[in-house]
Amino acid sequence: MVKYEDKISLYDAKGNLVAENVPLEAISPLYNPTIKSMLKNIKRTVAVNLADIENTLATGSIGGKGCKVPGRTLDLSVVSNAQAIADEVEKILKVSKDDDTAIKLINGGKQMAVQVPSERLEVAAEYSVSMLATAMALKEAIIKTFNVDMFEGSTVHASIMGNYPQVMDYAGGNIASLLGAPSNLEGLGYALRNIPVNHAVATTKKNMMNAIAFSSVMEQTATFEMGDAIGSFERQHLLGLAYQGLNADNLVIEFIKANGKGTVGTVVQSVVERALADGVIVVDKTMGSGFNMYKPADVNKWNAYAAAGLVAAAAVSCGAARAAQNIASVILYYNDILEYETGLPGVDYGRSMGTAVGFSFFSHSIYGGGGPGIFNGNHVVTRHSKGFAIPPVCAAMCADAGTQMFSPEHTSALVGAVYSAFDEFREPMKYVIERALNIKDKL
């Protein structure tokens, strides 16, 4: 069912036109088959680090930092027996002969991607079943493969699960998921926002447009779960996903190209010029000084144009530096300049600029406890702009040339290796657009 008259042109990650006059709802999480598939698979996919399990057992370093127990070591050739372990895990997890259980070994058996059968999620209240069922199946598989006795079973357990349940998550463990532990969520419906920037960047192999798309899909889909993208506010979030996340009408790439030798300020200029040309904003009145005050002809579309400009500003500024550290300042002052220039609200009606104030303090200023890449939409500092503030941070981390202490390679190697093996996670733009074209005439 088409609610909105909006039509968008879709472009690929390199700015090539794919299709015109596509209904806005074709990229909606409620209709788009790729987004639905991504959400289903993100809940049932678990990354396992078999190489680190082997090392953990060999050194007795169970439970994470500071938890080395020299007397509790096991010399097990986990990686060289990865196929046997994978076969046993699959056997344990399967519910029926033809279900969708899937096991994939990566990097010669050093890592393993486990997709639990959908039937297990259907009888669970939330997604923890994927991590827990995988962990217990893996533990049993290792015990069986190496004939581990009852006195060492707990050591195998700790090498997989880490410090849980002494801690709220799987700290020190060797399994991971993009969504993290639900016990760490900041509020109701925040699970899809609990994906660190570095995870998105690693999953998409530092491809900027795909990292932006991945982040935007997760952030904006979360707004449907949280009750934000409902009724009068649904169109705002769909336009944000289309223009900021999926480069609708090629806005993002055109803004970047036009300002390849520009600044955050020149990106603002491009956004205002394009919004005027497209009739998204109009001159409200001209002051005695000649300064124009504007008003939106379409306030939701103005927000979408501004959001597209924000990720372009991140690409221009952080790309010029080849460093991500200034992204909080980019988000803050892009919005500040935009508001002064137009008299209109910035991205997400001030919330992204407000987010950037705290983000700047906690990632860069007096405190500076963590680099931009470790933040997510569930973080107490960056949670406030729902859907619009995390994609530009992903753009910045893709442009970073290794300046960060908390780099994607450091924080997200396992997640990146496993989840990038799935096409729809690695190249979400391509597959969201493909399936949008499949359904556009059926809405």
UniProtKB/Swiss-Prot annotation:
<dbReference type="GO" id="GO:0005737">
    <property type="term" value="C:cytoplasm"/>
</dbReference>
<feature type="binding site">
    <location>
        <position position="367"/>
    </location>
    <ligand>
        <name>coenzyme M</name>
    </ligand>
</feature>
<dbReference type="GO" id="GO:0050524">
    <property type="term" value="F:coenzyme-B sulfoethylthiotransferase activity"/>
</dbReference>
<dbReference type="InterPro" id="IPR008924">
    <property type="entry name" value="Me_CoM_Rdtase_asu/bsu_C"/>
</dbReference>
<protein>
    <recommendedName>
        <fullName>Methyl-coenzyme M reductase subunit beta</fullName>
        <ecNumber>2.8.4.1</ecNumber>
    </recommendedName>
</protein>
<comment type="similarity">
    <text>Belongs to the methyl-coenzyme M reductase beta subunit family.</text>
</comment>
<dbReference type="InterPro" id="IPR003179">
    <property type="entry name" value="Me_CoM_Rdtase_bsu"/>
</dbReference>
<dbReference type="InterPro" id="IPR022680">
    <property type="entry name" value="Me_CoM_Rdtase_bsu_N"/>
</dbReference>
<dbReference type="GO" id="GO:0015948">
    <property type="term" value="P:methanogenesis"/>
</dbReference>
<keyword id="KW-0963">Cytoplasm</keyword>
<comment type="subunit">
    <text>MCR is a hexamer of two alpha, two beta, and two gamma chains, forming a dimer of heterotrimers.</text>
</comment>
<keyword id="KW-0484">Methanogenesis</keyword>
<dbReference type="Pfam" id="PF02783">
    <property type="entry name" value="MCR_beta_N"/>
</dbReference>
<dbReference type="Pfam" id="PF02241">
    <property type="entry name" value="MCR_beta"/>
</dbReference>
<dbReference type="InterPro" id="IPR022679">
    <property type="entry name" value="Me_CoM_Rdtase_bsu_C"/>
</dbReference>
<comment type="pathway">
    <text>One-carbon metabolism; methyl-coenzyme M reduction; methane from methyl-coenzyme M: step 1/1.</text>
</comment>
<keyword id="KW-0808">Transferase</keyword>
<dbReference type="InterPro" id="IPR009024">
    <property type="entry name" value="Me_CoM_Rdtase_Fd-like_fold"/>
</dbReference>
<feature type="binding site">
    <location>
        <position position="369"/>
    </location>
    <ligand>
        <name>coenzyme B</name>
    </ligand>
</feature>
<comment type="function">
    <text>Component of the methyl-coenzyme M reductase (MCR) I that catalyzes the reductive cleavage of methyl-coenzyme M (CoM-S-CH3 or 2-(methylthio)ethanesulfonate) using coenzyme B (CoB or 7-mercaptoheptanoylthreonine phosphate) as reductant which results in the production of methane and the mixed heterodisulfide of CoB and CoM (CoM-S-S-CoB). This is the final step in methanogenesis.</text>
</comment>
<dbReference type="InterPro" id="IPR015823">
    <property type="entry name" value="Me_CoM_Rdtase_asu_N_sub2"/>
</dbReference>
